[in-house]
Amino acid sequence: MDSMVDQQSQQPLEGQDRDARGGNEVNARSGEFTFNCPSTTDLRATDGLPLGANSQAQSAARSASSAEHASSATSSFIQVEDWDDSASLTDSVQTFPEEFGRTYHAYRAGSYLFPNDNTEQERLGIMGECYKMIMKGKLYLAPLSTRRPPKNILDIATGIGDWAIQMGDIFPNATIIGTDLSPIQPNDVPPNVYFYVEDSTSGCWSDFETQIAQQAFNALEPGGWFESQETDCIPLCDDDTLDPQGPVATWCNDLIAAADKLERPAIFGEKLKEIYERVGFVDVHQRIIKMPINGWAKDSRLKQVGWMWADHMLDGLSGFSYQLLNKAFERTSAQIETMLSAANSLIGVSN
């Protein structure tokens, strides 16, 4: 999820461009294997930037996907302030199509291949808590000031809206905007938090540098901050005990290959720092943080995070896999379940 924080402008960040979450790398282990997960990249806009149509002064951005250009994004917004009374939130947006026993977003169906049902919402909640714990209680790493707090914050691909809601509590005088394809955010939110149904994936797959990074740069005023946090899905191992031909590595490699075939690349976190610098951002900081999976870590905090991340992975196995593997390789449900069963037995193992 991406977020942009405007510290001077009084206008909401409607239609603001989004970037990918970058900055922390997390490792997940079953036995002694790990995944590179959340990666955070902080970026500051240079002085003398041209102001975009929806330019913001001091901004920090966070996302789980990417953003489309501000001009097109504004026209596609469906505001979600009151689920019961909002005339703009049509029944078609809330009637989620079902496939493989899971539900998916209805607005611009097919833009995003992961589900949005209760299991997925639970996974997103666990993921958010893991990110926060691995970052030692922080929601962001950009140097935002509570003495000179931001005026506007944009959270792109907000999911269940937990990050946006917490930011609304931290910065009560800021306007917090969260966008997502699915209206699955709660009703009870701080008065300064607003959610919109919007497609941030438009344009992000074909050319991230020009369609996302450059537009995000143009949308920020001098001094603006953008933060992206990415989860890498390549399994790593500290003690070389991970079988490169085993079920976990095979599952991950198949997902990466499927994503590439469908032109939705899963691996680009390692390229973000160079891309952001190339489009003009300065003070670009990349932080890589290891995320354990299950209970192998000796440190009590990391052990707790590891078990939570294992739950997150187990909740996500089918959601990550069905659309990608079926659409890319025409695999049947039975074939996918056989693969997931083998990976499941390793991800949840204890040391």
Regions found by a protein language model. Give the residues of each.
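N-terminal auxiliary segments of SAM/dcSAM-dependent transferases
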Residues: D2-E122
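Conserved beta-strand elements of beta-rich interaction domains across eukaryotes
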Residues: T103-Y104, A109-Y112, T158-W163, L181-I184, ...
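Conserved alpha-helix/loop element of class I SAM-dependent methyltransferases that forms part
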Residues: N118-N152, D162, Q166
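Acidic, Ser/Thr-rich intrinsically disordered and amphipathic helical segments
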Residues: R123-I126, C130, D162, Q166, ...
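Class I SAM-dependent methyltransferase SAM/SAH-binding core
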Residues: T146-D207
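Short, intrinsically disordered, charge-balanced linker/junction segments flanking boundaries
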Residues: S200-Q211, T338-N351
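A short glycine-rich, Lys/Arg-flanked "PGG" loop and its adjoining helix->strand segment in the class I
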Residues: I212-W225
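Conserved catalytic/acceptor-binding region of the Class I
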Residues: W225-G319
